[in-house]
Amino acid sequence: MNLTRIPQPFLTRFETAVRQNNTCRKGVMNMTNSEMQEAFLKQQNELRDKIEPVDKFEIRDLKLVAGVDLAYWTSGDDEYAVCCIVIIDMQTHQVTEKKQFLGRIEVPYMPGFLAFRELPLILKTAALLESTPDLFIFDGNGYLHPRHMGIATHASFYLNKPTIGIAKTYFRVDQKTDYTEPENEAGSYTDIVIDGEVYGRALRTHKDVKPVFISVGNYISLDTACTLALQLTEKESHIPLPTRLADLETHIAREAARES
């Protein structure tokens, strides 16, 4: 899969290194945490103005849907992660391709900037794909973020495809706004509203299960994101199939890496 070229002003030093197939370490080794945070914040604020939470496609045209997830672990003083991307056929729900990439995490954890830790592995995994998904679904958030720049949204500017964020746990954007439980019926939802703006939805995919938290990534509307989440959820789980399979693959890959 060919990744979209992003104008240089939108790239931090570490992302430039990733795009050149170098290690993330070459881009961040000379930056302090405060310098990184300043650079990351600048990029988020620049990109947020380019978010398009509207449908740029027709559901009937979707053929391949990808699920993306990462799993972390530590070894000594180092932190590692594996990213897995699983592609399924939209009609048959059969797996058509899966790829993974393992690497060391070089960016320290900073609240609100998780995408910068995960993007290097996601981009390298996506570059391994032999087919091109029509839609990417991330185990995480998109618009449901203090600056609307969760991983699902941030990655869209590189993948140049519609993206959705589907999280299993609720992320309090402002540390005070909670969500209202949807009715106990499949397809029921409540909007997550912060300061009068809809950031996402709590969606119940099955009766008698916990809701998942849907937010647009980019190039898709919230209504369509919820419709697709329901279409891609099978009876075995309340999590949509693409990210459920990606989650399973990351756990398998992580255990294999730990034992090696």
Model-inferred region functions:
Residues 18-30:
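Short, Lys/Arg-enriched N-terminal segments with co-localized hydrophobic residues
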Residues 51-61:
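A short acidic-Thr-Gly-centered motif at the start of a beta-strand
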Residues 145-198:
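A contiguous pocket-lining binding segment that forms or flanks enzyme active sites
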